[in-house]
C-alpha cells in the first residue's frame, strides 16, 4: 500500500497539544492525518480511533450523523488518557465522496435510509478501505489498540491486518432527534453496536 509519511508538526487544541502526522496515499492522491499524544510506540495497547472524514458533521455541525460528536469525544478521551492516536481518514461519506453524500442526503430527504440511498446511487453501503491504516500505524510503531468504535467492521479490518484490538471502547454520543433513524439503520443494517436504544427502530416499508 503506497502510503508515505510526509511531515509532522504540533497541533494545539482545546483538549491537548497533539502531534499531527501527514501521510499521502500515492495511489489515490488522498492526504490523511494522524493525531498522536504521548508515547504510543512502547508496545502497550494504545487508546485510538479510526475516524473517516465527515465535513458536514466534523466542521459544519450537522445533526444528521454522530460523527462530529464522536470526533470530539475521542480527542477528549485521548487527552484525558494522556496517550493515544486518532487516524483521520479522507473517506468522506463512507467512501463515496462529498458530492455523492449530498446526493444520498437528497434521497434520504425523500424517505430512503442511509443504506438504501447509497445503493440507489450505485454504491455499496460502506465503501471504506481500512488497509490504508496499516502503513500509518506501522510508521508510528502502534501494534495494539484499545479501539474507540461502535463498528465491528473496523475491529475485523485491524485484526485481519495483524493489528491487535485489545479492547473495543464504545462511543455512544451525539444522539439527537435528527439522526435517530440514521443510527437505527446503522445498528440494524450495518451491525453497529449501539446498545438497545436504536435496535429495531428502522421504519418498515
From Swiss-Prot:
It holds the Pfam family GTP_cyclohydro2. Coiled coil: none annotated. The keyword Transferase does not apply. Pathway: Cofactor biosynthesis; riboflavin biosynthesis; 5-amino-6-(D-ribitylamino)uracil from GTP: step 1/4. The active site is at residues 126, 128. Keywords: GTP-binding, Hydrolase, Metal-binding, Nucleotide-binding, Riboflavin biosynthesis, Zinc. Its cofactor is Zn(2+). InterPro entries: GTP_cyclohydro_II (IPR032677), RibA (IPR000926), RibA-like_sf (IPR036144). Catalyzes the conversion of GTP to 2,5-diamino-6-ribosylamino-4(3H)-pyrimidinone 5'-phosphate (DARP), formate and pyrophosphate. This is GTP cyclohydrolase-2. It comes from Pseudomonas putida (strain W619).
Amino acid at each position: 500500500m503506497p502510503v508515505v509519511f510526509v511531515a509532522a508538526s504540533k497541533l494545539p487544541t482545546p483538549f491537548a497539544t497533539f502531534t499531527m502526522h501527514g501521510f499521502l496515499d500515492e495511489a489515490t492522491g488522498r492526504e490523511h492525518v494522524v493525531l498522536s499524544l504521548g508515547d504510543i510506540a512502547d508496545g502497550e495497547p494504545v487508546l485510538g480511533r479510526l475516524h473517516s472524514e465527515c465535513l458536514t458533521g466534523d466542521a459544519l455541525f450537522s445533526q444528521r450523523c454522530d460523527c462530529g460528536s464522536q470526533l470530539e469525544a475521542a480527542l477528549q478521551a485521548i487527552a484525558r488518557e494522556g496517550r493515544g492516536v486518532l487516524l483521520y481518514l479522507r473517506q468522506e461519506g463512507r467512501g463515496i465522496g462529498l458530492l455523492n453524500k449530498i446526493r444520498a442526503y437528497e434521497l434520504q430527504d425523500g424517505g430512503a435510509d442511509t443504506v438504501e440511498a447509497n445503493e440507489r446511487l450505485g454504491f455499496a453501503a460502506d465503501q471504506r478501505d481500512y488497509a490504508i491504516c496499516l502503513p500509518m500505524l506501522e510508521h508510528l510503531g502502534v501494534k495494539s489498540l484499545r479501539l474507540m468504535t461502535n463498528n465491528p467492521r473496523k475491529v475485523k479490518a485491524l485484526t485481519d491486518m495483524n493489528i491487535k484490538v485489545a479492547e473495543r471502547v464504545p462511543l455512544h454520543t451525539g444522539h439527537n432527534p435528527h439522526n435517530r433513524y440514521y443510527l437505527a439503520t446503522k445498528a440494524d443494517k450495518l451491525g453497529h453496536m449501539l446498545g438497545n436504544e436504536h435496535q429495531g427502530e428502522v421504519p418498515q416499508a
